A protein has these predicted regions:
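A generic fold-level signal
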Residues: 33-34, 52, 182
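Charged alpha-helix within mobile-element recombinases
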Residues: 166-193
Length: 206
């Protein structure tokens, strides 16, 4: 049998699989897509040192009931780089989809606080600040049913090099938060939560 140490290790392994990535689909990003709405979300880290968390910006595009996560910008950036990346991500979305994102959701913590202040001062981006008021597991649990709306790009375009790491991070997310990184999970949570509260079923009008 397993000793206590072995049993604890086994329980830790089992503690993954909070997010069922099997329900996430794919879309053909080789074809031009028309979207109803585009939003961006950002999860920012405290610093750019190599042990720090990553800062992440996600581009989420709504088409009917589907949510296409079309691009992830991810890196360890200093504040000026973070600000530049945020503006670049917004402009990339405008140029790519000929649609101005309606909301740029930024978590009001770490460097996100200063980022919100600076972007408000320097730009006219549609900023929306969010303050996390629950632990990460509770937050993610509240949107688990929304993951089936999520679709990822299927082509081997180098811009999609983030997809495999993204799925790995989702799979590794644990209730006890002993996973290595959850910056892409956080970005996804904010998008799914925001869009779930704003989705309208057309059957309501029939």
């Amino acid at each position: 049998g397993l000793d206590d140490k072995g049993r604890g290790f086994w329980n830790k392994i089992k503690n993954g699989n909070v997010i069922n990535t099997e329900v996430i689909g794919y879309f053909n990003d080789s074809e031009p897509q028309r979207y109803d709405r585009v939003i961006l979300t950002a999860d920012t880290a405290f610093s750019k040192n190599e042990n720090a968390d990553y800062s992440v910006i996600g581009v989420f595009c709504v088409r009917g009931n589907d949510i296409h996560l079309t691009r992830i910008f991810r890196g360890r950036w200093d504040f000026n780089e973070l600000q530049t990346q945020a503006i670049n991500a917004y402009e990339w979305a405008v140029d790519t989809y000929h649609l101005s994102p309606t909301d740029f959701i930024i978590e009001k913590k770490a460097s996100g606080i200063s980022l919100l202040q600076e972007l408000k001062r320097l730009t006219h981006l549609p900023l929306r600040e969010v303050t996390p008021n629950k632990d990460k597991f509770t937050r993610v649990s509240s949107v688990l049913s929304e993951f089936q709306r999520l679709k990822l790009p299927m082509s081997k375009n180098p811009l999609n090099s983030w997809v495999s790491g993204y799925l790995s991070e989702l799979k590794a997310f644990r209730a006890d938060e002993q996973h290595l990184h959850d910056d892409m999970v956080d970005c996804t949570y904010y998008a799914l939560d925001f869009l779930a509260k704003r989705s309208v079923s057309w059957s309501d009008f029939l």
